[in-house]
């Protein structure tokens, strides 16, 4: 359990404004950065995460928001209601699950490349981004591109969505949301962009 009182954190998430991605890079809606709207909460989260790795650390920088994603389909397992495998361009990142009584298969899955390499082409990227922005994409076309892209990966670890659980991974870990479930999915995604210690956690 990450927060002592996660219900109070969920309450905070209801009193703020949310906006969609401007380019379809991620699904749903995100709040403004926590260091701007809830600086004490930001300090608590970043201090606790950073001290998982370092006893002392002079400074750090994170991008942290609340994120809400509503289902893209009435069918939980529709490809349009599933995440896209990706890695994050940061030192490390992760997510705190804040959905009470979440549906099964709404956590995070870790993958590896089947052949030691992978890529996303411009058509796959365009389909994904258009879908995340709420645009209309033909089901057959979407499924074709989704399946072709995801055939590059093999599942290695499946992590359940448990209320108040934190999941953390390094910048080259391939991962995706399993499904977006049948109701609103609330999380706190976080990304470390800078840390004062010379060595990252894996090398310490």
Model feature map: region roles:
Residues 74-204:
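Catalytic core of non-heme Fe(II) oxygenases with the double-stranded beta-helix
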